[in-house]
Amino acid sequence: MIKGIGLDMIDLDRVKQAVEKNPRFIERILTEKETKQYEKYEGSRKIEFLAGRFAAKEAYAKANGTGFGKHLSFTDVEILQVEDGRPHVTMPIKQGETVFVSITHTARSAAAQVIIEQ
């Protein structure tokens, strides 16, 4: 049974400006493991990765029904790549839940959809 569906989209320029204004923005969004993946990329691919994770985490919070705030922060949600390159939510997974995530990019934006099944 589907517990929730979340969708989010963000402009790449908005993410780039946030990083330029405050480099600690990256620490607010990415976990340590995600940051290691982020650091492997160069140039515009870094912004695409960060924007994709931002959108995916927003989509997760929407699918979860909580949004971000007192009970959930960006670094509480971790999305890593499995060996075949697909994104996979590694935390927080509640017992009995399956989380599906899809991330896409264009030249100007990143979008993500999350479905949580229970």
Swiss-Prot record:
InterPro entries: 4-PPantetheinyl_Trfase_dom, 4-PPantetheinyl_Trfase_dom_sf, ACPS, Ppantetheine-prot_Trfase_dom. It catalyses: apo-[ACP] + CoA = holo-[ACP] + adenosine 3',5'-bisphosphate + H(+). Its EC number is 2.7.8.7. Belongs to the P-Pant transferase superfamily. AcpS family. Mg(2+) binds at residues 8, 58. One of its GO terms (biological process) is fatty acid biosynthetic process. It holds the Pfam family ACPS. One of its GO terms (cellular component) is cytoplasm. Keywords: Cytoplasm, Fatty acid biosynthesis, Fatty acid metabolism, Lipid biosynthesis, Lipid metabolism, Magnesium, Metal-binding, Transferase. Transfers the 4'-phosphopantetheine moiety from coenzyme A to a Ser of acyl-carrier-protein. GO terms for molecular function: holo-[acyl-carrier-protein] synthase activity; magnesium ion binding. It is found in: Cytoplasm. Coiled coil: none annotated. It comes from Listeria innocua serovar 6a (strain ATCC BAA-680 / CLIP 11262). This is Holo-[acyl-carrier-protein] synthase. Its cofactor is Mg(2+). The lineage of its organism: Bacteria, Bacillati, Bacillota, Bacilli, Bacillales. Gene3D superfamilies: 4'-phosphopantetheinyl transferase domain. Transmembrane segments: none annotated.
